[in-house]
Amino acid sequence: MIEARHLRVLRAVATTGSFSAAARELGCTQPAVSQQMKALEASAGTPLLVRTGREMRLTEAGEALVRHASGILAGLTAAEEEVAAIAGLRAGRVRLVSFPSGSSTLVPGALAALRAAHPGTQVSLVEAEPPRSVEMLRDGDCDIALAFRYGTTGGEWDDLVVRPLLTDRLIGLVPDGHRLADADAVGIGELADESWIAGCPRCRRQLVEVCEASGFTPRIDFATDDYPAVIGLVGAGLGVAVLPALAIESVRPKGARTVTVEPAVEREIVALTLPDLARVPAVAATLDQLARAATR
């Protein structure tokens, strides 16, 4: 196999005309130059140099190799510099997938802090709810997935690096003027006869489970993945809802009141990545900034 260090020596010999001059240029000994040239000729399978008097002359094969060496070595140098920039966080790219309420609350502060600390790092953002976002991570379509789960699902993320960020409590949402709008806390069973407005499929399943545990099945009249739409429907008096605190934080409820719901239901917000990706400097830095944003 032809090695880059051998090409550098060959180019120096071709430029200077002798092993001794090449050794001086490269800062090594003449025997070292001779040894590397022998190794290069063995790899090439043909002579690359011939001695003419006191000078070394390139053979046809040597001329061909030197002709390509400059481009090869320049490309290798550029690659080394680019990799060093990525390793040193002077450059890098991170593909982030987040659920909508995470995009509007956690992500902006995290990315602003990342840009301030490492302006050469570029982050792209697309939105997807779990489990789709987790599938994208496993399929190689993103580097970090901001996701959530209710309770603990055994083995769900065992193949991933899980960075816990925060616990997000579900909050009740009722129209202004509702009989429970001024209550300090509301038992979920007190809303058994209400029309319900449900959120994303995973949140919807959790709503049904919580209600059924309290002895009733919610009558879901409207369902939408768009949390501002849920809040708008509640504000219009079309029903009640239970939403994550992050979702309500990102939109000012108009015509609706938030109430504490008992029993408490929480979801775990996490950042997920693959074990190998967790060692990539730009990914690790982004995970750190997401964790910091979650504590603000």
Residues covered by each model-derived region:
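A late-sequence structural motif
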Residues: 106, 256-296
